[in-house]
Amino acid sequence: MKAFLVLDNGMILEGESFGYESESVGEIVFNTSMAGYQEILTDPSYCNQIITLTYPMIGNYGIHPDNMESSKIQASGLIVREYVDLPSNFMSQKTLSKFLKEYQIPAIQGIDTRKLTRYIRTNGSPNGGIFVAREYSPEFLEKVKSFPGITGTDLAKVVTTSTKYIFGTHTGKKYKLAVYDYGVKTNILRLLDAAGFAVTVYPALTPAEEIMKEGTDAFFLSNGPGDPAPLDYAIDATRKIMEKGYPLFGICLGHQIIGLSLGKKTEKMKFGHRGGNQPVKNLSTGQVEITSQNHGFAVIDDGKSSEPVSFLNLNDNTVEGILKSGYPLLTVQYHPESAPGPNDSRYLFQKFYDLVETTKRGK
């Protein structure tokens, strides 16, 4: 079946459908990872986005339940150069095509993804849509232009859990950790549990006072989709957490929320960082880590906030982490849990546990 990729400037690219035969609109982004398409598709940070995978052949190893980062596909669509419908992997339980159809997600192959990626790098991430149809219709462009975009939209409310839940086991665990779910990935929860925390996950809108009353030793602010600026409730909760002196760890969107709560600003990036090969320098040690990233907004270091930067991206000098003098705080813009990506930064989960222990001993 034919499929059409339509951008908001009127560009039309024709290809072939290999997902659900429907249509979807969203922000068009690209990810440079060579593998990990299942983890990418199920990452809640991709809510309202259509993903272009730059690696030219996708689907080779199929789908396995252990590679899910949430309960479903979160992206709005998928764009690839060539789809492989015969996976070679003893663990594969289904094809990528079947997986997409189960969750009613359209996908298009036969697209010049190099050309599309170069366009995005030059012009910024456009709004666009995938439309599965026998012929092109002018209505497709109208639907793309009606998409409101990512900026100014609270997407954390869309992907957060509706109820509080316990992750892993609490038996024998010394410290309770409250996780704010703005779109948390499963592997983050696994690694927090493995670090020794008794993990409880809370909906994004849960008042900080309610969690404090229940009892916790520390807080974690998760990754999530879109623009952090509209999340007033999250910024307010973070300020209350810091007023009480709780140890705090934020990843990706969580890092941005902490930045806003400290008086810094955020901005939308031209095309963002999405892939598993971003070099980041730890400014306290001088060590460079290769990191997995997925974000389209960044904290600005405009010099107006006194809080120092702790990590820096070596490709474009964007802020990758911030500190607060005298406060038990750890933030990173990147994804230390990888899934997919390198494991260079997984030590941060144990580092946070040690930070909590040091803080509790000092009280």
From Swiss-Prot:
EC class of the enzyme, as a word: ligase
Locate the active site. Answer: 252 (nucleophile), 335, 337
Under the GO molecular function aspect, what terms does this record hold?
Answer: ATP binding; carbamoyl-phosphate synthase (glutamine-hydrolyzing) activity; glutaminase activity
The record places domain Glutamine amidotransferase type-1 at 176-362
Q: Which Pfam families match?
A: CPSase_sm_chain, GATase
Q: Where is this region: CPSase?
A: 1-172
Q: Which UniProt keywords apply?
A: Amino-acid biosynthesis, Arginine biosynthesis, ATP-binding, Glutamine amidotransferase, Ligase, Nucleotide-binding, Pyrimidine biosynthesis
Catalysed conversion reaction: hydrogencarbonate + L-glutamine + 2 ATP + H2O = carbamoyl phosphate + L-glutamate + 2 ADP + phosphate + 2 H(+)
Listed CDD domains: GATase1_CPSase (cd01744)
Q: Which family does it belong to?
A: Belongs to the CarA family.
The protein's name in its UniProt record: Carbamoyl phosphate synthase small chain
- According to its UniProt entry, this protein's organism is Leptospira borgpetersenii serovar Hardjo-bovis (strain JB197)
